[in-house]
Amino acid sequence: MATGLERSDVEGTMVFLSMKKLLYSILLLIATVSCVGQKDDPEDLPTPGGEPVEEPADGPEGGAYFRRSLVLDFTGTWCVNCPKMEAAIKEAQAQRSGRIACVSVHCLAVDNLALLPESGELATRFGVTAYPSAVVDLDPASLITVSSPELLLSHADRLLEQRPEAAGLKITGSLSGGVLTASLEAEVVRDGSYSFSLIVVEDGVVASQTGGSADYVHGNVLRAWKDSEVFPSCKAGDTLAWTVEAKASEGQRIVALICREGIVDNVALCPAGGSVGYQYEE
């Protein structure tokens, strides 16, 4: 027979477990409510899978640098409409072959794919309160909650018009013992303040998806995000460099950013531990 002290311990444990279940239920309810309605065709779902490293046809060295845009896809395995935003992003990528990189930012603690606390910090930074949402080139004014390739491309084109030429960006990386060491170098073509970001993503992640399937294949899943200090008062022609370490593994990918005044100026891609040089327009 349990003593009074033991009964108290058991009762305390039961209360703790009940509170834990209640907290999980509340988080799940918040997640469900946050998943906004869409006007998409319910059958308009993406082909599951990741995004291969896109290599442009390299132009002559010394010309304008090849320009890419970035889309942050704020998503969740719990969100019934989130696969529709993924489909919209893939359609936008198809219309701008090799020009758009995507990072899937899984959010909320109920999502086992969420990188915490980074995903929550990113959602707060861009004012994300509904899912799915997308942000182009880290520009808060580009936040959308409608799964539309046309809207995504309109923001991408608007921001590209503001940078007719973009900085060149190259990556030199190595991977050992689960640690990625990446050296980023950029040659800027406009005056301004610049910064780097190193992002690690993973493709082919199998996890249940509401609105998808129990064995849904997720791509571009955010695994690490590192930001450099700001390089102030840069002049056109300056070369900037930054070396950083992050956790990574074989098969993951690097999405590197060079940002001007906080907005993406250019994007470079390569496998984790790999390297890629400056790329040029044809």
Regions found by a protein language model. Give the residues of each.
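Short, conserved sequence motifs used for protein processing/export or organelle targeting and
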Residues: 104-282
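Membrane engagement elements in two modes
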Residues: 45-48, 54, 84, 91, ...
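Local sequence-structure signature of Cys/Sec-based thiol-disulfide redox active-site neighborhoods
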Residues: 60-100, 105
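Bacterial Sec-dependent N-terminal signal peptides
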Residues: 15, 19-69, 282
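Secreted/processed peptides and extracellular or luminal domains of membrane proteins
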Residues: 41, 85-88, 276
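Sequence contexts marking disulfide-bonded cysteines in secreted/extracellular proteins
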Residues: 36, 80-83, 271
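N-terminal secretory signal peptides that target proteins for export/translocation
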Residues: 1-19
